[in-house]
C-alpha cells in the first residue's frame, strides 16, 4: 500500500513558491485550534517547567492553545491513501481521506474538495467534527471552515454535553447551530436503545446557547411515551434553561380531588430565576404559585406567593406569602426579613406545600425584620417580630420592637468580661395575657487559671430586669405593673485532667480521667409578679447541668446553692488524636431548696440531689458509632429518661441507624411519656438497587408514629424511586393523633429533567446519613475524542 500523502493547500492570495507551501502550512499549525472560553494560566505559571538538565523534557502545566489571529486564514490539510487534482483549485482524495481546516475535520472513504468555494463532498463512512460536535453518516456536503452544509441520515454526538441522536437529515448552519429533520435526542451515553429519548419532526440545536428545541416532540422512557408538546425546549448540558418543567399529578384526595400542575421556569439571569406553577385542583379551582429567587454579593433571598381565587369549597379568596431576605450592608452591618402569612386557619392543612408532611402542619408563621451589627467585641440586634398563630397552637410573644446589645472581651490581663443589654416590648395576640416593656442588663466578669492538667474559673454576674406592664394576667387588683429585680450570681468552674497510656483489645490508647466541679450561688428573689415573656424550664442533661440557671429566658433567675460533680474518661488514639470513646457520670447536690418556680402555683423542689446522669459515646472501626444517655432517679430506683442510638455506615449509601427513646411521665411537668423505637436505613440490595426505610414505633400504644419505606434504582442515564410514607396529621376530636398515608415517587432522566413529589426530601429527613443517588457523570472533555 502506498504511503499516505500530506497535501497542504494555502489560500490563493499567498504568493509563496510551491516548494515553500509545506513549510508555511506547518508554521500555521499552532493556529489551527481556536480559543475556548475556559480559564487559562498566565504569566510564569503558564510557562513549561524544566528539569535539572538543559536537555531534559519540560512539564507543561496546561494544554496550550493559540487562537487564530484576527484576519488570518488557517491552512488546509488533506490526508489520504491516494490524492490527485489541481493545486489551488480542487482535489480528489480516496482511502481514509481527511480534510482539516482550523478546528474542523472531515473524514470519509472519498472526498472531493474545491478550494475556491471551500466545499467538500464526502462519501462513505463520513465523519464531520467541529468544536466538539461530531456527525457521522454515508455522505456530507459542506463548506469546511464555515461548517455550512448538509448530511444525510446522520448520527451525532455533542462531546461537551454528552447528548447523542440520529435523524434523516441535518442542515449545518455554522459550528454551533444545526437543524435536524425527523430525529431523536438523548442524554444517554449508549448509542443504541437509550433508556430515554426525545423524538421530533425537527430539532434546532445551538451548542453555544446550550439549547435544544424539538418541534412536535415526544419524550419516551423505556419505549413508552411520557409527554408530548408541539414546542419542547431543553438544555443540552442539563443546566438551567427557561421553559416548561415536567408536570406533576397528585392522586384523588377527599380534600382537594385531583391535582395537576405544570410549572414554567424563567432563567432570568445567572443569579435570578422565577418559577410560575399553575395547579388545577378539581374541587377548588386554579391555584397559582410563583417563586422568585435572587442572589448577589451582598444580598440573597426567596419570595413565594400563592393565590387561589374564589375557592369553590371555602367560598373565598385564599393566599399565602413567604419571603426570606438576607442583606450585607458592609462594615459589619447587615439586615434580614422573614415574612410569612396565610389567609386563614385551614390554609396549611388544605393547601400547604409538601414540606408539611416532613415537619408537621405549620401553625406558627414568623413575621420579622431586623438590622444587625457585628464588629470585634460588639454585637447589636434591632428587630420587629410578630407571629401569626393558627389554632390549636398557643401564640408566642412578639417583640415589637427589640434592641439587644452585647459586648464581650476575652483575656484582658487574664480577665474575660462583657455585658448584655436588652429592651423589648412584648405583645401577644391572645386575650387576657400580660403585655409590656422589659429592660434587661446582665454584666459579668471572670478570671481563668489554666494549666496543662487543670482549670480554675471563678465568675460573677448580675441580672437586672425592669418591667413596665400595660396589662397583667386577668387584671388582678393590686398586682404591680412596674417593678425591678437585681439578682447577683457567683460561680466557680474547676477541674483536673489526668492521662495515661493503656492497651485495650490489642490497640494503644491515651486514657484521660477528668473530674469537674461546678458551684453556683444565687440568692432568692421573689419574681412571681414577672410574666413569662420568653422563659421556660431548661432541659436537664449533660449540656445543661453546667449552666447557672435552671430556666431559659430572662423572666426567671433560679435561686441556687448547688454543686455539680462530674467525672469523664476518654480513650484517644495516640497517633491521630481521634476520640474513640467517652464515658460521663454527673450529679447535682443542693445545699438549700430552690424556691423560685416557673409558676407561682408550683411547689418548690426539696430534693437534696438531682437525678444521676450517665452518658457514653463510642466509635469503633468500619463506621460503627454509638451515643447513649440516661437520667436515673436513685431515690425511687427509676429510669426517668433514656436515649440510646447506634449507627453503622461502612461506606457510601450504606447506613443503618437504631435508636430507643424513653421518658417517664412526670405529673408535675404535665409531660407526655415517650417509649419509642426508631430505625432507619439506606442499603444497596444490588449494584443499582437501594432500599430506604424509617420506622418510629410507639411501644406504649402499639402503633406506628411515622414510617417510610421505599426503593431507589440508579441506572446509567436515569434513576427511579418510589416510597410509601405514614405521617402524623394532627389531633382528632378525641385528642388522639391522626395518621395519614401518601405515595412518593421520583423519576430522574439524567441530563434532561427530574420529577419528584417529595421522595428525596422525605428520605433526607427520615434517614440520618442518607446520601442521594449520584448525578450523571460529567461529559468527556472535547480533547478526549480528538479526531
From Swiss-Prot:
Disulfide bonds: none annotated. Residues 1-39 form the signal peptide. One of its GO terms (cellular component) is transporter complex. The keyword Protease does not apply. InterPro entries: LipoPS_assembly_LptD, LptD, LptD_C. Keywords: Cell outer membrane, Membrane, Signal. Its main location: membrane. Pfam families: LptD. It comes from the Bacteria. HAMAP family: LPS_assembly_LptD (MF_01411). Component of the lipopolysaccharide transport and assembly complex. Interacts with LptE and LptA. This is LPS-assembly protein LptD. It comes from Burkholderia mallei (strain ATCC 23344).
Amino acid at each position: 500500500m502506498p504511503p499516505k500523502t500530506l497535501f497542504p493547500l494555502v489560500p490563493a492570495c499567498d504568493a509563496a513558491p510551491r516548494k515553500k507551501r509545506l513549510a508555511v502550512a506547518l508554521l500555521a499549525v499552532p493556529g489551527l485550534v481556536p480559543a475556548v472560553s475556559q480559564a487559562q494560566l498566565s504569566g510564569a505559571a503558564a510557562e513549561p517547567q524544566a528539569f535539572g538538565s538543559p536537555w531534559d523534557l519540560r512539564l507543561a502545566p496546561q494544554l496550550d492553545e493559540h487562537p487564530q489571529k484576527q484576519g488570518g486564514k488557517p491552512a488546509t490539510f488533506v490526508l489520504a491513501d491516494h490524492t490527485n487534482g489541481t493545486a489551488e483549485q480542487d482535489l480528489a482524495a480516496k482511502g481514509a481521506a481527511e480534510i482539516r481546516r482550523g478546528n474542523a475535520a472531515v473524514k470519509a472513504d472519498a472526498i472531493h474538495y474545491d478550494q475556491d468555494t471551500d466545499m467538500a463532498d464526502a462519501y462513505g463512512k463520513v465523519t464531520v467534527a467541529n468544536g466538539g460536535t461530531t456527525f457521522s453518516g454515508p455522505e456530507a456536503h459542506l463548506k469546511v471552515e464555515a461548517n455550512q452544509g448538509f448530511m444525510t441520515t446522520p448520527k451525532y454526538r455533542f462531546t461537551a454535553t454528552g447528548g447523542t441522536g440520529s435523524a434523516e437529515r441535518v442542515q449545518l448552519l455554522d459550528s454551533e447551530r444545526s437543524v435536524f429533520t425527523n430525529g431523536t435526542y438523548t442524554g444517554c451515553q449508549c448509542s443504541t436503545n437509550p433508556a430515554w429519548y426525545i423524538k421530533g419532526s425537527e430539532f434546532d440545536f445551538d451548542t453555544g446557547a446550550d439549547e435544544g428545541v424539538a418541534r412536535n416532540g415526544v419524550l419516551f422512557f423505556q419505549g413508552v411515551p411520557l409527554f408530548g408538546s408541539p414546542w419542547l425546549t431543553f438544555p443540552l448540558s442539563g443546566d438551567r434553561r427557561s421553559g416548561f418543567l415536567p408536570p406533576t399529578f397528585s392522586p384523588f384526595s377527599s380534600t382537594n380531588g385531583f391535582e395537576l400542575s405544570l410549572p414554567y421556569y424563567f432563567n432570568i439571569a445567572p443569579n435570578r430565576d422565577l418559577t410560575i406553577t399553575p395547579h388545577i385542583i378539581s374541587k377548588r379551582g386554579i391555584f397559582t404559585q410563583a417563586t422568585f429567587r435572587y442572589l448577589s454579593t451582598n444580598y440573597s433571598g426567596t419570595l413565594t406567593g400563592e393565590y387561589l381565587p374564589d375557592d369553590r369549597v371555602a367560598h373565598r379568596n385564599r393566599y399565602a406569602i413567604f419571603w426570606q431576605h438576607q442583606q450585607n450592608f458592609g462594615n459589619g452591618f447587615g439586615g434580614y426579613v422573614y415574612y410569612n402569612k396565610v389567609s386563614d386557619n385551614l390554609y396549611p392543612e388544605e393547601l400547604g406545600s409538601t414540606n408539611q408532611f416532613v415537619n408537621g402542619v405549620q401553625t406558627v408563621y414568623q413575621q420579622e425584620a431586623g438590622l444587625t451589627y457585628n464588629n470585634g467585641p460588639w454585637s447589636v440586634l434591632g428587630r420587629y417580630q410578630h407571629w401569626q398563630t393558627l389554632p390549636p397552637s398557643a401564640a408566642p410573644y412578639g417583640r415589637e420592637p427589640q434592641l439587644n446589645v452585647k459586648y464581650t472581651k476575652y483575656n484582658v490581663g487574664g480577665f474575660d468580661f462583657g455585658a448584655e443589654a436588652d429592651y423589648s416590648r412584648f405583645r401577644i395576640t391572645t386575650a387576657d395575657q400580660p403585655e409590656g416593656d422589659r429592660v434587661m442588663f446582665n454584666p459579668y466578669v471572670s478570671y481563668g487559671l489554666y494549666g496543662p492538667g487543670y482549670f480554675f474559673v471563678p465568675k460573677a454576674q448580675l441580672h437586672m430586669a425592669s418591667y413596665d406592664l400595660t396589662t397583667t394576667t386577668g387584671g388582678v387588683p393590686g398586682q404591680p405593673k412596674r417593678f425591678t429585680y437585681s439578682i447577683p450570681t457567683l460561680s466557680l468552674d474547676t477541674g483536673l485532667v489526668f492521662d495515661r497510656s493503656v492497651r485495650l483489645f490489642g490497640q494503644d490508647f491515651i486514657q484521660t480521667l477528668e473530674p469537674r466541679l461546678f458551684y453556683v450561688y444565687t440568692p432568692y428573689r421573689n419574681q412571681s409578679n414577672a410574666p413569662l415573656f420568653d422563659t421556660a424550664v431548661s432541659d436537664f442533661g449533660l449540656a445543661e447541668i453546667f449552666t447557672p440557671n435552671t430556666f431559659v429566658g430572662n423572666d426567671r433567675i433560679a435561686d441556687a446553692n448547688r454543686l455539680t460533680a462530674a467525672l469523664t474518661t476518654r480513650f484517644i488514639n495516640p497517633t491521630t488524636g481521634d476520640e474513640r470513646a467517652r464515658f460521663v457520670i454527673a450529679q447535682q447536690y443542693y445545699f438549700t431548696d430552690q424556691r423560685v418556680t416557673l409558676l407561682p402555683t408550683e411547689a418548690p423542689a426539696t430534693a437534696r440531689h438531682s437525678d444521676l446522669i450517665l452518658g457514653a459515646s463510642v466509635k469503633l472501626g468500619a463506621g460503627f458509632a454509638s451515643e447513649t444517655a440516661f437520667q436515673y432517679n436513685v431515690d425511687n430506683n427509676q429510669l426517668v429518661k433514656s436515649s440510646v442510638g447506634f449507627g453503622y455506615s461502612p461506606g457510601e449509601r450504606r447506613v443503618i441507624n437504631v435508636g430507643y427513646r424513653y421518658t417517664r411521665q412526670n405529673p408535675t411537668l404535665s409531660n407526655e411519656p415517650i417509649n419509642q423505637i426508631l430505625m432507619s436505613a439506606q442499603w444497596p440490595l444490588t449494584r443499582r438497587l437501594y432500599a430506604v426505610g424509617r420506622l418510629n414505633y410507639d411501644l406504649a400504644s402499639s402503633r406506628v408514629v411515622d414510617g417510610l419505606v421505599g426503593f431507589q434504582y440508579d441506572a446509567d442515564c436515569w434513576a427511579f424511586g418510589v416510597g410509601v410514607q405514614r405521617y402524623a396529621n394532627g389531633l382528632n376530636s378525641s385528642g388522639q393523633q391522626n395518621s395519614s398515608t401518601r405515595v412518593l415517587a421520583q423519576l430522574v432522566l439524567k441530563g434532561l429533567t427530574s420529577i419528584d413529589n417529595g421522595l428525596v426530601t422525605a428520605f433526607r429527613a427520615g434517614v440520618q446519613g442518607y446520601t442521594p443517588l449520584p448525578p450523571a457523570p460529567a461529559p468527556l472533555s472535547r480533547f478526549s475524542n480528538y479526531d
